[in-house]
């Protein structure tokens, strides 16, 4: 069956396209033609214009495991905290499969303590672990409501989470749950006893290397270079991961042994951490160099960046969001 559009429909579509382009062009001057500005008119369900309540920004990074937020968003968190924002990290899973020697119970206990140590380094409001088992986050209504209730309690201005396309089932599931919450967070009768948000959060999707169905769109790029020392210090707290499990998984245990005393050989420790866990940050700085120059006219492309895509499932960004994220 062929579908035909009348002349009026074509004209209306053309006008709407032009209006969208005008809004997109006018939306971003200070940070060049940052593609994130195109979302002023691109969030069809969440188009609210409710102003921000004065006070520190609240940012909630919802990752699947107790090191996801640190690895992929740590430099962003360090920047925002330095600018006065309140930042909360979340691990929906307890990390109990993340070791090759410890049993599940011990792994979960060790990782909980490691996240507490990392939280102190970052200066987080908190580092919450919801307790689901690794590779066991259900994609169901009760789990979605657990996540939604925690979001409503913190009332974030911005949420950062995973994209749907990712190598780990927990990453995909958590990302879908957060996006599913997006519009519903403002509905008073959705969560029984919950606190509906009068102003829904902006949702950002953290960077990844996947290209199917498409690569991430670099709407917002954060310079990591000024924060790498703190990033290394925080990752160093998660001994079971970066010096044990992941080293074993990658077959690089000999490099860990070569570091020796990590409390003394800080340079060696940091070199090791950056060698293996900043590859994406370095790759993104290269592949998104043109986007960086659009967003930060006149500034040299950094060596490492954290990249984010603005999700259409959250509210549209406002000038304050870009100033917090992309401003000096």
Labelled PLM ranges:
Residues 99-102, 214-218:
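Short acidic, glycine/proline-rich loop/turn micro-motifs
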Residues 26-154, 184, 325:
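Active-site rim/loop-helix segments in enzyme catalytic domains that contact anionic ligands
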Residues 31-53, 191-192, 199, 213-214, ...:
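C-terminal accessory domains and tails appended to enzymatic cores
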């Amino acid at each position: 069956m062929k579908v035909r559009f009348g002349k009026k429909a074509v004209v209306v579509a053309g006008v709407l396209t032009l209006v969208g382009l005008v809004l997109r062009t006018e939306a971003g001057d200070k940070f060049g033609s940052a593609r994130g500005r195109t979302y002023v008119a691109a969030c069809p369900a969440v188009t609210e214009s409710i102003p921000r309540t004065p006070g520190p920004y609240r940012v909630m990074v919802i990752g699947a495991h107790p090191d996801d937020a640190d690895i992929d968003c740590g430099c962003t968190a360090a920047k925002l905290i330095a600018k006065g924002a309140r930042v909360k990290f979340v691990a929906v899973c307890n990390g109990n499969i993340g070791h090759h020697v410890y049993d599940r119970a011990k792994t979960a206990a060790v990782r909980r303590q490691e996240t507490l140590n990392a939280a102190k380094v970052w200066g987080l409001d908190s580092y919450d672990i919801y307790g689901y088992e690794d590779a066991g986050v259900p994609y169901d209504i009760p789990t979605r409501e657990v996540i939604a209730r925690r979001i409503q309690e913190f009332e974030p201005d911005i949420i950062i989470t995973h994209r749907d396309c990712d190598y780990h089932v927990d990453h995909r599931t958590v990302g879908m749950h957060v996006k599913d919450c997006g519009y519903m967070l403002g509905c008073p009768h959705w969560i029984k006893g919950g606190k509906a948000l009068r102003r829904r959060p902006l949702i950002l999707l953290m960077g990844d290397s996947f290209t199917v169905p498409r690569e991430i769109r670099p709407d917002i790029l954060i310079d990591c270079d000024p924060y790498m020392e703190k990033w290394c210090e925080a990752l160093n707290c998660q001994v079971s991961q970066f010096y044990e499990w992941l080293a074993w998984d990658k077959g690089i245990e000999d490099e860990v042994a070569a570091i020796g005393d990590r409390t003394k050989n800080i340079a060696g420790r940091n070199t090791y951490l950056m060698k293996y866990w900043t590859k994406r940050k370095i790759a993104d700085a290269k592949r998104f160099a043109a986007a960086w120059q659009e967003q930060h006219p006149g500034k040299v492309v950094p060596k490492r960046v954290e990249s984010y895509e603005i999700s259409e499932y959250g509210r549209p960004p406002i000038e304050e969001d870009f100033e917090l994220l992309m401003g000096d």
